[in-house]
């Protein structure tokens, strides 16, 4: 089976690494000449709206999937004429636009911060008055890793904020005094079978994920599964989806979904019986899903901007290095380390060792 992937970054790379043992081959459509997944399959170098090369991809593969959600709707519609596409167009339409996403949460009865559509500075002024400050102004599309957003703490911050984000459609979200950030990675098969990985505790730095620690018997696991299950069923979703939540007053409030394999699920490569990457491929290919059970105590640390010396990273016991082969650049995810340990105390010690290498 040959899988087409829109995007050739590290997520596409890790999909290929997981799919090769299953006998799968890959073709990546990505305009970047240095796409880091290119060495693991065919690289069709073209823009995401280039219909000639999209048709070439469709003709060569058995199905198409995505490594990011900001795919032009026209691209999805065009590909769907010629080849199965997973996840479906509706899933991408909802997930790429924060207004549609938040509206879906509300329709499904999933708690989420107060929000308002912002199409102008006047809209922002009215929304800030209604929701109150502090609040977060976000572009409706394209923002990720802390980009495309601005925290508004006082009235002076509101003035000119719409222009600061490019005068594009935005959403204002009420600030949530959360006690923690967690995410749930789930996988849904073509026949609707659904499996969930353990909830993960996430730590961010300047909006970029820094550390994910897989939980054991989290008291909110069942609630998170309920909320995620509602979304998967509504979208008739196929593949892996990640749902990020805020922990608030002993419950959960929805932050956002990602209709793809997700950074907070990287720990599953060594820390679960079947990784998120393999399970995504199993789902879209119509294969039986793998077990999402955790193996040992696991965590993932991102390498942002640079990877510490390889010899030092692999010298840490229970540590597995994943180097993306990308040029080092401030703010860029260029690799990660996964840790799988026998117990929680050992895991915390190993996290501290890797953090020391990152900070050195």
UniProtKB/Swiss-Prot annotation:
Organism the protein comes from: Pseudomonas aeruginosa (strain ATCC 15692 / DSM 22644 / CIP 104116 / JCM 14847 / LMG 12228 / 1C / PRS 101 / PAO1)
Superkingdom classification of source: Bacteria
Pathway the protein contributes to: Purine metabolism; IMP biosynthesis via de novo pathway; 5-amino-1-(5-phospho-D-ribosyl)imidazole-4-carboxylate from 5-amino-1-(5-phospho-D-ribosyl)imidazole (N5-CAIR route): step 1/2
Catalytic activity: 5-amino-1-(5-phospho-beta-D-ribosyl)imidazole + hydrogencarbonate + ATP = 5-carboxyamino-1-(5-phospho-D-ribosyl)imidazole + ADP + phosphate + 2 H(+)
Binding-site list for ATP: 98, 138, 143-149, 173-176, 181, 204, 255-256
UniProt keyword annotation of Ribonucleoprotein present: no
Free-text function comment from the UniProt entry: Catalyzes the ATP-dependent conversion of 5-aminoimidazole ribonucleotide (AIR) and HCO(3)(-) to N5-carboxyaminoimidazole ribonucleotide (N5-CAIR).
Domain annotation ATP-grasp: ranges: 102-285
EC number(s) reported in the record: 6.3.4.18
Keywords: ATP-binding, Ligase, Nucleotide-binding, Purine biosynthesis
GO cellular component, one term: cytosol
UniProt key word Magnesium: no
Upper classification of the organism: Bacteria, Pseudomonadati, Pseudomonadota, Gammaproteobacteria, Pseudomonadales
UniProt xrefs under Gene3D superfamilies: 3.40.50.20, ATP-grasp fold, A domain (3.30.1490.20), ATP-grasp fold, B domain (3.30.470.20)
Example GO BP: 'de novo' IMP biosynthetic process
Enzyme class: ligase
Family: Belongs to the PurK/PurT family.
Name of the protein in question: N5-carboxyaminoimidazole ribonucleotide synthase
MF term (GO), any: phosphoribosylaminoimidazole carboxylase activity
